[in-house]
Swiss-Prot record:
One of its GO terms (biological process) is neuropeptide signaling pathway. Beta-endorphin and Met-enkephalin are endogenous opiates. PANTHER family: PRO-OPIOMELANOCORTIN. This is Beta-endorphin.
Length: 31
């Protein structure tokens, strides 16, 4: 269980960056 928590913590920033990239891409398409 401890390993799962560690992997989840390291995975969260990647998900945030991925979402930010999608939002930026959507803004570029909007313009």
């Amino acid at each position: 269980y401890g390993g799962f928590m560690t992997s989840e913590k390291s995975q969260t920033p990647l998900v945030t960056l991925f979402k930010n990239a999608i939002i930026k891409n959507a803004h570029k398409k909007g313009q």
